[in-house]
Curated annotation (Swiss-Prot):
Subunit structure: F-type ATPases have 2 components, CF(1) - the catalytic core - and CF(0) - the membrane proton channel. CF(1) has five subunits: alpha(3), beta(3), gamma(1), delta(1), epsilon(1). CF(0) has three main subunits: a(1), b(2) and c(9-12). The alpha and beta chains form an alternating ring which encloses part of the gamma chain. CF(1) is attached to CF(0) by a central stalk formed by the gamma and epsilon chains, while a peripheral stalk is formed by the delta and b chains.
Membrane-traversing stretches: 17-37, 75-95, 113-133, 182-202, 206-226
Role noted for this protein: Key component of the proton channel; it plays a direct role in the translocation of protons across the membrane.
Keywords noted in UniProt: ATP synthesis, Cell membrane, CF(0), Hydrogen ion transport, Ion transport, Membrane, Transmembrane, Transmembrane helix, Transport
Protein name listed in UniProt: ATP synthase subunit a
A molecular function GO annotation: proton-transporting ATP synthase activity, rotational mechanism
Native organism taxonomy: Bacteria, Bacillati, Bacillota, Bacilli, Lactobacillales
Gene3D superfamilies: ATP synthase, F0 complex, subunit A (1.20.120.220)
Top-level taxon in the UniProt lineage: Bacteria
Matching CDD domains: ATP-synt_Fo_a_6 (cd00310)
Gene Ontology CC: one annotated term: plasma membrane
Alphabetized NCBIfam families for the sequence: ATP_synt_6_or_A (TIGR01131), PRK05815.1-4 (NF004479)
Length: 239
């Protein structure tokens, strides 16, 4: 796809304006969703409160499945916020497609950009190291993370840190980007073939949107789950 993004710079540093705008919009959507779903809370939840409590229980399950139960309060809010952000970021690009005549894209999923997913993965991997140092002290963290069970595995453990970062980021990026590419190809087919393509293109577009929504949800789950798995490797002492 020959698409370009809005760009701007602050001094010598250039930024992708489309991505910055979509990341900000994603944050606002998450904030207002939580605000809307938490208004007028009741002891007997109904409707929107049930939906929010289901997401809360779902993310609690991710944490307790991968970390000791005593760590639930420390990481549940992180998992909940991360899941909502990645879920919205994955699926926001399915709402519409805005491209200017100059081929400048104004609307897309932020996680369809590799720099966004690499940044998210870098933040999560960095947090695992910080929490490991906080809980075990620097010496305990270093020994637990890189020298156990055998010290000769240190080079492999070091390489593993980089592969964890890359796989966490590129898995998310690849799935979301591929979905948006195919949606764009279907839309281009409709544009090029005209009305004759509608009986085939519209059902195909609807099916692929539904499939992309499913994939986006699964990838949000996978991203949070792997983040908690990597966290457990850093804060749990290996025997």
């Amino acid at each position: 796809m020959d698409e370009r993004s809005l760009t701007f710079h602050i001094g010598p540093v250039w930024f992708d304006g489309t991505v910055c705008m979509m990341v900000l919009l994603t944050c606002l959507i998450v904030f207002f969703l939580v605000y809307f779903f938490t208004r007028n809370l009741k002891m007997k939840p109904t409707g929107k409160q049930n939906a929010l409590e289901w997401v809360i229980d779902f993310t609690r399950g991710i944490v307790t499945d991968n970390l000791p139960r005593k760590e639930l309060n420390n990481f549940h809010l992180l998992a909940f916020t991360l899941f909502l952000f990645v879920f919205v970021a994955n699926n926001i690009g399915l709402i519409t497609k805005i491209v200017l005549p100059s081929e400048t894209t104004l609307w897309k999923s932020p996680t369809a950009d590799p720099f966004v997913t690499l940044t998210l993965a870098f933040i999560m991997i960095t947090l695992t190291h910080l929490f490991g140092v906080k809980k075990l002290g620097f010496k305990g963290y270093f020994v637990n993370s890189f020298l156990k069970p055998y010290s000769f595995m240190f080079p492999m453990k070091l390489i593993e840190e980089f592969t964890n970062l890359l796989t966490l980021a590129l898995r998310l990026y690849g799935n979301i980007y591929a979905g948006e590419v195919l949606l764009t190809l279907i839309a281009n087919m409709m544009n090029n073939l005209g009305w004759f393509s509608l009986p085939l293109a519209i059902p195909l577009e609807m099916v692929w949107i539904a499939f992309s929504l499913f994939i986006g949800s699964i990838q949000a789950f996978v991203f949070v789950t792997l983040s908690m798995v990597y966290m457990s490797h850093k804060i749990e002492v290996e025997e």
